[in-house]
């Protein structure tokens, strides 16, 4: 069962009425394990940056963390799927901070079959609440026999997936698609990890035709990493070394405890 808290206390019907009827907020999601989060600082930076853009208001990390700790303490949990949503409201600075807690989730392990579609999110740099197109394209991809949608911009460049970023691997270099997309926290953690490991990386335009064997590819988001099996029926390599390399890169980035002080 999902539990929702608003500004550090259990949410009321009135607290949730606005977010239920509008889509003018923004959010971040992550997996909490033993009261620690990979890339917690990146999630806090995301929330503050989006609040400044959408609402012309800073969102102090201490406020977010106080609300998160209060929610975790209220249900006495150390592991959860967490969503923090920021919406206009009666809270400090005219903003309400909603913390939603659900059961912890693990990534699917089966490689994904993707169906490409020409689509680019509005205000792509912000993780905003206008998610209908993402899940509608995902639904259509599944109806067509794929597992998810791969977004390609009007110029024919691969940019991102429905709720994930992606990278390519040729055995020596990780390639990150260049384009107007939401830059994910897991993507940034992996980039830092590959740098720490000395793995070569590049960011450049990628076209769907590149996504086939002998190239391998993976999807990543806050839930984890997942290999990509095919795009539009064209198989990619399933390099058995890539999942281990991704895990090694992530392992260089220590989780951050939610009870530690934040700046």
Give names to the regions the model predicted.
Residues 1-70, 87, 91-263:
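Helix-start/capping segments and mature chain N-termini
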Residues 77-86:
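Ordered, amphipathic secondary-structure segments that act as subunit-interaction surfaces
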């Amino acid at each position: 069962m999902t539990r929702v808290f608003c500004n550090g206390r259990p949410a009321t019907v009135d607290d949730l009425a606005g977010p239920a009827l509008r889509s003018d907020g923004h959010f971040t999601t992550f997996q909490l394990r033993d009261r620690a989060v990979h890339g917690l600082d990146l999630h806090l930076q995301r929330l503050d940056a989006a609040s400044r853009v959408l609402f012309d208001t800073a969102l102090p990390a201490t406020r977010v963390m106080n609300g998160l700790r209060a929610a975790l303490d209220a249900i006495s949990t150390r592991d959860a799927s967490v969503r923090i949503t920021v919406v206009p409201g009666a809270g400090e600075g005219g903003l309400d901070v909603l913390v939603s807690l659900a059961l912890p989730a693990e990534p699917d392990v089966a490689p994904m079959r993707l169906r490409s579609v020409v689509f680019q999110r509005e205000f792509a740099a912000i993780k905003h609440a206008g998610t209908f197109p993402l899940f509608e394209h995902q639904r259509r991809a599944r109806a067509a026999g794929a597992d998810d949608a791969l977004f390609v911009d009007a110029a024919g460049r691969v940019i991102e997936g429905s709720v994930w970023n992606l990278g390519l691997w040729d055995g020596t270099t990780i390639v990150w698609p260049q384009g107007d997309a939401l830059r994910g926290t897991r993507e940034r953690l992996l980039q830092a990890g590959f740098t720490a490991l000395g793995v070569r990386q590049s960011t450049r335009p990628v076209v769907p035709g590149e996504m086939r064997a002998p190239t391998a590819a993976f999807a990543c988001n806050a839930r984890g990493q997942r290999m990509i099996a095919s795009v539009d029926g064209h198989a990619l390599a399933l390099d058995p070394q890539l999942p281990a390399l991704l895990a090694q890169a992530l392992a260089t980035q220590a989780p951050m405890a939610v009870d530690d002080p934040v700046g």
